[in-house]
């Protein structure tokens, strides 16, 4: 007599079932698995692109990052190093070099905190870089759609002189209706070596 699996209740034959009923048993099991998998939640992150940063580069362009498949993306920059003691990792979408706006909250563990802004600049402040590593974790919404693009990111500069640490939170938008597929990361000073840029798409 057929039994069922303990977790999903899929029908499976037992060792005493007739061999002649094997095809029917496999069909029933396949239908049950298909129904379960089809009903599983689809939300989550899917890796879209991994871009390795070269040696002593002045910018990194990530192509085929955005498409109609996803409305929102997570971008993570990690590893590697900056030749500058502290640099800002600036982001531009496509070839657009104007219209970027953002609010920036910065905490320096020895110098206190500050709030600044970007109004119609040539880039977003997206992350930070120091010789000890590159840092940025951010979300971008609607870069491919013909709508304004918004972003939110955080970054930490580790190992600054005297054991100091710098943290930034950045939020902003680009108020055009251009559809973008690529973005570029440029250090505000010096060059970048090593590390990766990973782009994930948010499933609906």
Task: State what each model feature region is.
Residues 26:
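Charged, flexible cofactor/metal-binding loops and thiol motifs
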Residues 3-13:
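Short, contiguous pre-domain boundary segments
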Residues 2-4, 17, 21, 30-204:
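Surface-exposed molecular-recognition determinants
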């Amino acid at each position: 007599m057929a039994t069922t699996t303990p977790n999903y209740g899929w029908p499976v034959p037992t060792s005493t079932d007739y061999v002649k009923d094997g095809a029917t048993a496999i069909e029933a099991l396949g239908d049950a698995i298909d129904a379960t998998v089809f009903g599983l939640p689809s939300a989550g992150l899917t890796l879209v692109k991994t871009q390795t940063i070269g040696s002593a580069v002045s910018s990194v362009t990530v192509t085929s990052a955005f498409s109609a498949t996803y409305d929102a993306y997570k971008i993570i920059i990690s590893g590697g190093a900056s030749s500058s003691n502290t640099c800002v990792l600036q982001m531009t979408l496509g070839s657009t070099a104007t219209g970027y706006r953002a609010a920036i909250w910065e905490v320096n563990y020895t110098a206190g905190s500050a709030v600044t802004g970007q109004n119609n600049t040539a880039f977003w402040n997206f992350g930070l870089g120091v010789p000890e590593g590159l840092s940025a974790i951010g979300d971008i919404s609607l870069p491919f759609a013909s709508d304004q693009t918004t972003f939110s990111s955080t970054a930490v500069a580790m190992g600054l002189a005297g054991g100091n640490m710098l943290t930034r939170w950045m939020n902003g938008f680009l108020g055009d209706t251009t559809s973008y597929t690529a973005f570029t990361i440029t250090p505000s000073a010096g060059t970048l070596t090593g590390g990766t840029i990973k782009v994930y798409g948010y499933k609906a």
